[in-house]
Amino acid sequence: MKTRIVSSVTTTLLLGSILMNPVANAADSDINIKTGTTDIGSNTTVKTGDLVTYDKENGMHKKVFYSFIDDKNHNKKLLVIRTKGTIAGQYRVYSEEGANKSGLAWPSAFKVQLQLPDNEVAQISDYYPRNSIDTKEYMSTLTYGFNGNVTGDDTGKIGGLIGANVSIGHTLKYVQPDFKTILESPTDKKVGWKVIFNNMVNQNWGPYDRDSWNPVYGNQLFMKTRNGSMKAADNFLDPNKASSLLSSGFSPDFATVITMDRKASKQQTNIDVIYERVRDDYQLHWTSTNWKGTNTKDKWIDRSSERYKIDWEKEEMTN
């Protein structure tokens, strides 16, 4: 089945019965992020600011923190872009065909991508997380070592000196129960992370994934009962018994490091930040003896893109 894309400038393709999920609160660590300019020693300052946008149509709250690192002893300027906020889950029953058949739209993946146009002088030099993550929680403190490099400390220490490095005020943290993070082929112009559904236990049965199959019951990922006497729309698993990302959404917390030559003639850079949600179509139908489930992958893609302008001389980032 052909994938259909929903962007922030088009109308939604789901039926009107799907309501927008309330956007969950961003991680409470936001209140600990200090904005303004900080002198971290060795002739180096860190200037931090934030930008917030809300794509109501697609249920995406984008919060970007940025930190310019100005090390007068180094020939390049650095910018750390931290992408946070919330991508709503939108786990919703979207269709009913009588009592015996119904469809559920559910989020199988969340994505964040940053991309520099090919003609930009600036380059992506690093990113966190740097690898794929399959644990429930990820945490890393970003530090600067006065050598032109930002590094991540996965012990999650906050503030002060960490070895020979100094914290720049950012500790990344996010949770992904029943999902895993995949780093998507980074280059010096593009980096992205895909947080994709892995598998899940359904009421002590399973685990089941997007491809699970039983010859009698089909895919049982979101099947509440195998033989229950209820409408199909009432036989989907309650969201409070599934991964929190399905109903409450995903709160990303990724970081990208951009470098810029101090001697470059043009000290302005454009960068695109893209948030995305991929949804599968899970169907239940009654076979005359039992319920049977099917799952169609990647049925809907909801995308929200924002272009930001970086001014390296003024140490400002705007949208």
From Swiss-Prot:
Bridged cysteine pairs (disulfide): none
Endpoints of the signal sequence: 1-26
Consequence of gene disruption: About 10-fold decrease in virulence in mice, increased presence of neutrophils in the injection region.
InterPro entries the record matches: Aerolysin/haemolysin_CS, Bi-component_toxin_staph, Leukocidin/Hemolysin_toxin, Leukocidin/porin_MspA_sf
Pfam families attached to this UniProt entry: Leukocidin (PF07968)
Principal place of residence: secreted
GO biological process terms held by the UniProt record: cytolysis in another organism
Coiled coil (UniProt feature): none
Function: Alpha-toxin binds to the membrane of eukaryotic cells resulting in the release of low-molecular weight molecules and leading to an eventual osmotic lysis. Inhibits host neutrophil chemotaxis to the lesion region. Heptamer oligomerization and pore formation is required for lytic activity.
Quaternary organization: Self-assembles to form first a non-lytic oligomeric intermediate and then, a mushroom-shaped homoheptamer structure of 100 Angstroms in length and up to 100 Angstroms in diameter.
Family listed: Belongs to the aerolysin family.
Entry protein name: Alpha-hemolysin
